[in-house]
Amino acid sequence: MIDQWDGSCYRRTLVIRERPLEVSVRQLPGPASPVLGVELRGSSATLADEDVAEARRVLELTLGLGVDLGGFYRLADGDERLRNLARRFSGMRPPCFPTVFEAVVNAIACQQLSLAVGIHLLNRLAEHHAPTRSGGGWPPAFPTPERLAETDPQDLRELGFSRAKSHAVILLARQVATGEVDLEALRDEPDDRALATLVALSGVGRWSAEYTLLRGLGRHHVLPGDDVGAQNNLRRLFGLDQGAGYDAVADLAQAWWPYGGLVYFHLLLDALATAGDVIIAAFAAAESPSVASEVAGGVRRTAS
């Protein structure tokens, strides 16, 4: 699996400066304010300071460590249903994919599929097309654009991708690898321009584009209005009319501005917990955890 969690340790292999870097993250015991201990492992004898700095940046992005939840909790206090949801998952931070490319590929892969099937498909993609093989049981890194650009569509078909999705993923990989499309530049673009760029890509419609704004660009005000799962959850918890679609979801999201995306994540967690796919433990305090460990620089470094 790309992301691994054993109940106390989160593990993932990141591609940092074109090299795999294996990351493990734990919440350290002791202080009242949450502190995360991070261990990095690379293939070279030493890790450069630039590697550590980039790994820190990516972890802060992917784990949502810089997100201030105070405004969301104040909003939730004004609505009993939202308040109960927020309290149930107090301290939950919005995750983000390490790269916009990974977010778009996730969106394409998960179109018209259940979350479980989509995740299975993406894990198979990583297992067969990771840019490098990690040792010691570490997770496979998500494939780079350069790696997927060299892949034949039939290879993805054999993993379970549809013909259209296979072509869309490989075309996107080639566009990014050659510089024809710069997805990371979308981080500096306003929503409307980012959406226009995304929907112009093969295989990307409104849902995929809005999903990418939320999961790839960290636009936490965006609630993907075409998301069928979100619509079902809104009906279950907020009384959204049966048959109500994008416009009705957009109206609700406007009332929650600028936290529609945070509501989306809480609804997803609630649905997973209700289905027994997530075990609710003692969630972290609402304040931001800091990235630290026992050594100077905030990260323990090892070489494999």
Label each PLM-derived region with a short phrase.
Residues 1-304:
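HhH-family (HhH-GPD) DNA N-glycosylase catalytic core used in base-excision repair
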